[in-house]
């Protein structure tokens, strides 16, 4: 006859199983699962109840093209807007245009650059909280900025060598010093007009080269760096060389980068990273729940840039500290498993609920 099976075992077998997600609090109805169970999802569930594997508000949406990733994201965003959350979103395909207009949000067309939306890569993001500052860790603000600038240069020019990148960091620090900025600086009262631009960095490079009458190894590195930086202050100046022109007091900010996605690969990657870094700087107000949405995240991870992937992983790790939840959208898990960024990709997944 075979092995007898108790009736409780039979009752637990497919297709008789039934499950659902009914999060308490300010939840959004996402739909039903394969067994017909209702899915009521509260991204900030950890704030009201402890639950296994729900210890932060970070989420990743995966799916092939046309599978409904953006539709699901917009459902979640609508719920957060109604619940009074601050929204910061990077929108590569202009899919948030209607919802932004409906709810009175602000759209910044970064693809046009210049007066339409300039983000100064050298502006410092103050992402040290009060506890870190009390512990004397305020210097990490500038340290993280320098790391981000090195990541930016790797996106802008993947062929940049380590010696040129190290020299770039030294030159940037020298430029900051000319503006009264060092590791002990209190940035809390700084405005966008207080920071140097790439024009100032380029001037520092030229000044150091002119001070070296003879050809040396250091001068050779500086000259190679000059060639790398020059396009940033000439043909690409409307994207990278100027003071930040974007207001920072919006409750619903969308960065439209559709026009940017058609630009040259390295320029697109550098701009995407620069936008993400600035967007993270808008998510540091602990008095309100904030959502940071990053669509087409594979653009950042597909460039084999460890520093850039590490920045996204740091955002995932630090988001909870600032009452921020992330929505990272990409097409497939393999986007996070490239050998060059697999450590950071694992951290991005591990820090999602």
Predicted feature residues:
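The conserved Walker
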Residues: 65
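P-loop NTPase motor domains
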Residues: 2-39, 45, 92-105, 110-112, ...
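Hydrophobic positions on the alpha1 helix immediately C-terminal to the Walker A/P-loop
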Residues: 72
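Post-Walker A helix-loop "phosphate-sensing" segment adjacent to the P-loop in P-loop NTPases
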Residues: 79-88, 103-106
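Conserved P-loop NTPase catalytic core
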Residues: 344-353
């Amino acid at each position: 006859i075979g092995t007898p099976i108790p009736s409780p075992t039979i009752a637990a077998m497919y297709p008789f199983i039934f499950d659902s997600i009914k999060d308490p609090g300010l939840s959004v109805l996402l739909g039903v699962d394969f067994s017909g169970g209702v899915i009521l999802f509260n991204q900030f569930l950890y704030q009201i109840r402890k639950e296994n594997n729900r210890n932060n508000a970070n989420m990743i949406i995966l799916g092939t093209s046309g599978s409904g990733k953006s539709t699901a994201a917009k459902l979640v965003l609508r719920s957060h807007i109604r619940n009074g959350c601050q929204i910061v979103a990077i929108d590569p395909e202009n899919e948030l245009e209607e919802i932004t207009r409906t709810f009175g949000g602000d759209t910044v067309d970064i693809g046009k650059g210049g007066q339409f939306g300039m983000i100064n890569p050298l502006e410092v993001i103050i992402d040290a909280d009060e506890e870190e500052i009390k512990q004397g860790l305020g210097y990490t603000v500038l340290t993280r900025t320098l790391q981000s600038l090195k990541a930016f240069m790797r996106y802008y020019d993947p062929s940049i060598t380590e010696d040129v990148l190290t020299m770039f960091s030294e030159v940037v620090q020298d430029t900051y010093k000319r503006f009264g900025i060092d590791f002990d600086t209190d940035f809390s009262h700084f405005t966008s007009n207080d920071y140097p631009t790439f024009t100032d960095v380029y001037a520092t490079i030229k000044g150091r080269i002119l001070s070296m009458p003879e050809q040396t190894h250091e001068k050779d590195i500086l000259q190679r760096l000059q060639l790398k930086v020059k396009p940033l202050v000439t043909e690409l100046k409307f994207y990278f060389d100027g003071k930040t022109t974007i207001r920072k007091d919006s409750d619903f900010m969308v960065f439209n980068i559709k026009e940017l996605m058609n630009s040259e690969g390295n320029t697109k990657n550098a701009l995407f990273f620069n936008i993400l870094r600035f967007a993270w700087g808008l998510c540091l107000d602990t008095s309100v729940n904030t959502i940071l949405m990053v669509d087409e995240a594979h653009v950042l991870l597909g460039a084999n840039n460890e520093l850039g992937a590490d920045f996204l992983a740091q955002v995932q790790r630090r988001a909870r500290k600032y009452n921020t939840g992330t929505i990272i959208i990409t097409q497939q898990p393999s986007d996070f498993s490239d050998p060059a960024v697999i450590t950071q990709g694992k951290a991005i997944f591990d820090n999602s609920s």
